[in-house]
Amino acid sequence: MPMQGAQRRLLGSLNSTPTATPNLGLAANHTGAPCLEVSIPDGLFLSLGLVSLVENVLVVAAIAKNRNLHSPMYCFICCLALSDLLVSGSNMLEMAVILLLEAGALATRASVVQQLQNTIDVLTCSSMLCSLCFLGAIAVDRYVSIFYALRYHSIVTLPRARRAIAAIWVASVLSSTLFIAYCDHAAVLLCLVVFFLAMLVLMAVLYVHMLARACQHAQGITRLHKRQLPAHQGFGLRGAATLTILLGIFFVCWGPFFLHLMLVVLCPQHLTCSCIFKNFKVFLTLIICNTIIDPLIYAFRSQELCRTLKEVLLCSW
C-alpha cells in the first residue's frame, strides 16, 4: 500500500515483530488515554475478499460470454469488476502471505519478501486507481447517454471506449509505480487525495445534473398528461434517495482510506491521528466492501447480464 501504515507488514511478519506503523499506538502507550481501535478478524477480512473475488469473476465471465454485452457501457462495467477483483485479490494475497510468515509456514529471505511487498503494493495501488477511474468513466458514459442521446453511439464508440480503457490501465500502472517508489514524499500522498476528491466531485456533478434532467423530464410528462404534482415530487424524492445512496456508499467506503493518507501528511506525529492510523485495516475492509457493492449497483441491475450469469452458473455445474 502506498503509505507508511502498510509498507512493512510483510517484513514485520518475517522478523516476528508487530506489524504496526512506526508511531502508531504511541498515544495510548505514553499518555494512557483511550484510543479507539476496531479489530477486524483475519478470517472476516479474507471472507469478504473471497466474496468480492467470486462476485466480480462472475460479472467478468457473464460479460465476456454474451456478445450482446460487448458495448462500451458494459466494457466499462467489466473493467470496473476486473479492477475490483484485483483490489480484493491483492489484499487477500498480502494477508495470506502475512499469515503464512507469522505461522512459520513460509520461509524466505527478507529481500524476496521486500520484492513481493513492492509487487503487491503496485498491484493494489494500480487496481484502486483503476477502480476509481472506471467509476468516473461509467458516470461520464451515463451522462453522455442522457444529454446526447441522439449522438451517443457516434460519440461513445467501441474503439474509443477501448482506447480509453487502455489509457486508464496504462496510466494507473505507471502512476502507481511512481507512487510506490516515492511513497515517502508528502506530494505523492496529496496527489492521491486530490485524485479521489476530483473523482468524487466529477461523479457528484454528473449525477446531480442527470437527476435534475430526469426531474425536468418527469415534470414535463406530468404537465402533458395533467397529472397531480405529488407524483413528480415522489419521483424527485426517489431519484434523490438513489443518488444519495450511490454517492454515500462511494464516500463512506473510499473516504476513510484517503483521509488516512491526508492525515499521514498533515499530522503524522499527533496523538489523535495516531489513533486513526491504528484503524487502517478497517479502511481497507471498507474498500473491500465497496468492491462487493459495485456489482450490485452497476452490473446485477441489468436483466440481460443476470440472464447470462444464470447461464454461466448452470454451465459450471
Curated annotation (Swiss-Prot):
GO terms for biological process: adenylate cyclase-activating G protein-coupled receptor signaling pathway. This is Melanocyte-stimulating hormone receptor. Residues 64-72, 141-163, 212-240, 301-317 are cytoplasmic. It comes from the Eukaryota. The gene is MC1R. It comes from Alouatta sara. Belongs to the G-protein coupled receptor 1 family. Residues 1-37, 94-118, 184-191, 267-279 are extracellular. It is a multi-pass membrane protein. The lineage of its organism: Eukaryota, Metazoa, Chordata, Craniata, Vertebrata. It holds the Pfam family 7tm_1.
